[in-house]
Amino acid sequence: MARTVIAAFDEFVKDSVNLDSERTKKARSSRDWLVDQVLGFPDKDSDFPAIYAEKYIFFGSFARRTKKRPLDDIDTMIALKAQGCTYLEYTDRIEITVPDTSAQFKKLCNDNASILNSKKLINLFVKNLKNVSQYENADIKRNQEAATLKLLSYEWNFDVVPCFFTTEDPFG
């Protein structure tokens, strides 16, 4: 039992706000293992687009080390090689146009169009996550722009968000 206000505050922060350091280590290890599995998807599924292995991004409060209890969400972006895809920004959306030369992305387009369907792309992530044997009992689904993975063995969810690494066009 704390004897001073400062000691009571420190105890409160340690026990109720800050993440437990051992759980944090376990979460980072679990996140890193997940990323390793995702990086292997193109080798196991010929329909899965190429990944920029060096371009995955840890983001969100857990990555920024500003997450407070409970540890319930870990966010990761996985960068895909654009393979000639281009994008246009509108006020309400971004459209990715897929060239005929990109067979893997063509399969993920809207019917009879060359516009990438983000739901199909995320569902491809979901399908491949379900094929990881350690995740066979996990709750895996598409949630907006992420493939969400809820493990039975941990209290946190993983949100895996696909993104693209493109090169500049002549206009910047």
Model-derived segments and spans:
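Short loop/turn segments at strand-loop or loop-helix junctions that form parts
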Residues: 78-83, 161-163
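Catalytic cores of NTP-dependent nucleotidyl/adenyl transfer enzymes across multiple folds
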Residues: 1, 30-35, 109-172
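Acidic Asp/Glu-based divalent-cation binding sites
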Residues: 75
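N-terminal regions immediately upstream of nucleotidyltransferase
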Residues: 1-71, 82-110
